[in-house]
Amino acid sequence: MTALTDIVPPGVVTGDNLLKLLEHARDNGYAIPAVNCTSSSTANACLEAAAKNNSPVIIQVSNGGGAFLVGKSIKDANAAAAGSVALAYHVRAVAKYYGVPVVLHSDHCAKKLLPWFDGMLEADEEYYKMFGEPLFSSHMLDLSEEPDEENIDICVKYFKKMAPMKIWLEMEIGITGGEEDGVNNEDVDPEKLYTTPEQVYSVYEALSKIGPMFSIAAAFGNVHGVYKPGNVKLSPEKLLTHQEYTKEKIGSSLERPIFLVMHGGSGSTDDEIKLAVSNGVIKMNIDTDTQWAYWDGLRIFEAAKHDYLQGQIGNPEGDDKPNKKQYDPRTWVRKAEESMTARVALSMEKLGSVGTYPKSSEPGSQQVLGKKVNVVDGVISAVKGLLPH
Ligand SMILES: [Zn+2]
């Protein structure tokens, strides 16, 4: 196995490095968790999980997440784009300190939300002019509600705009059940919850003419959100049929020529996840489970410290004792973060990404652009350069 550390630098990865990262996942049979983030706090919790588990991570923002990030009081047509860009800048500013590859992605964009997508693309273009790479690594278009032909046409139109900046496109075809971001598929005909190999191939055919950097979320009985077990029949074995069909059509030497993405994975069994990954899933979305984890950390903290959280002064240790340490947001938000970090780590374990990006164990060394650089040596040679010869 080629070491990921030798081919992909730490920090936000875009373009060729992103392609290398996802090819590495495909070729080595693991997937990367993509976690919906709605704040700097939740983003940091993901970065912490990635750093502690030597794993790459995908941080993604939804339209609703973007609108929340800008501030709920702001009612502006560009609010969601502005908030999404703000999260991207936050992640860009801090990612390098965590020492692992980070993918910046935007989640489901239905037809009515295209102005949000356009706003983020504008930010990508601006960033590209300044730094020669886009702000985001990747964006998702979800036109699965539209007829297939229109879905694919719109994806082609956008992918042509994105390809020159080497931005990844994730698209969805077929119906994922449940409800997310205002799209409600709760009462859909169960037969329609499975994308066919022909549908997947038609996407491959259209997008591969433009570039290799795209992935497909094909429905295989997945449902957004958490449902009672038994209500959904997940069929990850169908994903292999997609791979085989396209492989045959294009005569590919790759066993799994298509990058697949798993949505609606909350509540899936470990075996279902494993089978999906072995059939070419390289990214799995996580939202519902990490939302719960974030809340659960706070819930447990409040239950344990309840009597210290009822007023600014006065607790079981005395009527005049201050409680500032307990109600400082850095205390209780941190509890939420720790709980979410642990949940993201669990997903990394299930998806097999743990340990794929080992940081150097040599003291004082860190990775810069994939090369191990000894910080002490670097400082010594810099100091030597300053001394008179
Ligand atoms: Zn989806």
Predicted regions and their residues:
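Short, conserved beta-strand segments within well-ordered enzyme catalytic domains
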Residues: A34-N36, I58-Q60, V103-H105
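Flexible, glycine/charged-enriched surface loops at secondary-structure junctions
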Residues: I32, M165-E172, I210-S215, G251-P257, ...
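N-terminal amphipathic alpha-helix/helix-capping segment at the start of soluble metabolic enzymes
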Residues: M1-P33, S252
